[in-house]
Amino acid sequence: MFVTVHSPPATSHQPSATNHQSPATNRYHQPPTAPAIASVSLPTFLSTDPLAAEASLTLGEDAAHHMRVLRLEAGARVQLADGQGSRGVGTVVRVAKRNATVQVDSCEYVDPLPPVHLVVPIADRERMLWLGEKATELGASSWRPVMFKRSRSVSPRGEGPTFQQRLRLRMASALEQSGGAWLPMPFPDSTVETSIAAAPPGIRVVLEKGGAPIAALLAGDSSAPVTIVLGPEGGLDPSELELLAAAGFLPASLGSTLLRFETAGVAALAVARAVRG
């Protein structure tokens, strides 16, 4: 899958100035005259295939279409990312009707941010898509949707394979716009029990009015993974709160006002990144 950011055309032949285990060193070899990260003015193409210096990539029909819209021709410089820690710079070799070829000039591996995992309620589709976009910009490590007991019945709702595909596309676009290197790992719809079992050992919080300030709870070991649970707008059922408490989830507060789940998610992630990096 390839997605582009709609930036001004870049046809110059001159290079622009400028988380997971690191792959082998030779994969990220960079020629001294070609910096891996180009100017943000260059259009970006996200690949699900890993990047490798000097490799030739064949981009699909969507990417070729966007290249034609941007009037990119052979010799144009583009940015590349794979969503798994690699970013780089490439040169367009050919733009055809159904595909395009790009030569990877250089790439580099970007270490992942300290892990912050997000458990979200299944809710209104557009609001979930918006949160997925912002979660990507803020560097969420994973995204796990849960059907809580008090989740409201809305239509259309953000669930199922079709929604998950739309979410991945939205996240891909957000990654390109933000200049990030890692896409959140999207998990399928699950239950409270499944999300608890999947949470890694570390700092666990559930957003709940009356809890301790979230910044204080997240100020512990900076290397420990963080899992943040967002409840539905109807609130968490007492039985769900009991399950979370038994699994070590501490109630955390974002202040005295009542926030929508997507606002709370953005605020919690922003605090986590400010406190933990």
Residue spans of the language-model regions?
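N-terminal positively charged helical leader segments and presequences
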Residues: 1-7, 11-13, 20, 27-108
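Glycine/charged-rich beta-loop-alpha catalytic/anionic-binding loops adjacent to active sites
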Residues: 57-59, 113-117, 224-227, 246-254
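Non-catalytic positions within long, well-ordered alpha-helices that form the structural scaffold/packing
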Residues: 68, 136-139, 245
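Short acidic/polar active-site loop segments enriched in Thr and Asp
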Residues: 73, 141-142, 250
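Active-site/ligand-binding-proximal alpha/beta "capping" segment
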Residues: 202-241, 249-254
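Structured adenosyl-cofactor binding patch, chiefly the S-adenosyl-L-methionine
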Residues: 238-277
